[in-house]
């Protein structure tokens, strides 16, 4: 029993720094034992993303390990956090390749409230959180509900190839994830912490024909549109990049 308890304690605290960045970005990835197809190996694409974010990349085996790492970060210090691991819409898998199917300490499950609360305390205002996992969109509202200060949670409802995940600069000055999928089978969607409220913006006529009437319908493609060309501005000169929470704007309550 003592050996078993010691092993569990080790697994809970096991982490490994893969790359050290000088920015305010943190990426959690699983250990190779929980990565059956090497999706989270540090290949050229992953290293390029880490360089762009100036991110520290840490491999974790348990929620406890991720929590221990976050606990050492200063409050309000992280502008970007990626939670990477295989998924099926119910959790982000870390673990050892076996336990994460049912053990709630091995992967990031919706009821990991202590971890999400700790994460919220470490984020800056309007931080970006990426669920870097297949089929993770159902988790995004749950994660966003636990956050504050206009944090944006990005996720997709499909499975995707990691080489298609790229970061682009949005109008708020943040690097946000996009999926450049040549088959257009997946896209990143965004859910915002509940304390952010949209400012008035009425979409121009050409956008309304595409089903976008205001901030509630905005997609990241609209957020990334250039306000300077006037194509997304309303009659009052307001654009989504300065009005909509999904675009990193809006009013914080």
Where are the predicted features?
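Catalytic cores of nucleophile-dependent amide-cleaving enzymes
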Residues: 80-166
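Active-site or metal-binding loop neighborhoods of secreted/extracellular toxin and effector enzymes
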Residues: 1-22, 34, 113-118, 127, ...
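A domain-level signal for caspase-like cysteine endopeptidase catalytic cores
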Residues: 1-73
């Amino acid at each position: 029993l003592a050996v078993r308890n010691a092993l569990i304690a080790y697994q809970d605290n096991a982490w490994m720094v893969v790359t050290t960045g000088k920015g305010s970005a943190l990426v959690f990835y699983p250990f190779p034992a929980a990565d059956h197809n090497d999706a989270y190996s540090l290949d050229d694409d992953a290293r390029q993303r880490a360089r762009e974010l100036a991110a520290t990349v840490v491999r974790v085996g348990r929620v406890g390990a991720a929590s221990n790492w976050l606990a050492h970060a200063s409050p309000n210090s992280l502008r970007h956090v990626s939670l990477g691991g295989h998924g099926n819409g119910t959790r982000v898998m870390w673990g050892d390749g076996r336990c994460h199917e049912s053990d709630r300490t091995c992967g990031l499950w919706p009821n990991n409230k202590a971890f999400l609360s700790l994460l919220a305390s470490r984020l800056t205002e309007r931080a970006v959180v990426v669920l870097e996992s297949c089929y993770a969109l159902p988790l995004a509202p749950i994660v966003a509900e636990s956050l504050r200060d206009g944090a944006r949670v990005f996720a997709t409802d499909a499975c995707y190839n990691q080489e298609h995940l790229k970061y682009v600069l949005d109008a708020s000055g943040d690097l946000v994830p996009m999926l450049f999928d040549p088959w257009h089978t997946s896209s990143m969607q965004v859910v915002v912490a509940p304390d952010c409220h949209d400012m008035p913006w009425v979409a121009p006529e050409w956008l309304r024909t595409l089903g976008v009437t205001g901030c509630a319908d905005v997609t990241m493609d609209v957020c990334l549109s250039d306000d300077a060309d006037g194509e997304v501005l309303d009659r009052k000169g307001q654009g989504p990049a300065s009005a909509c929470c999904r675009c990193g704007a809006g009013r914080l309550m």
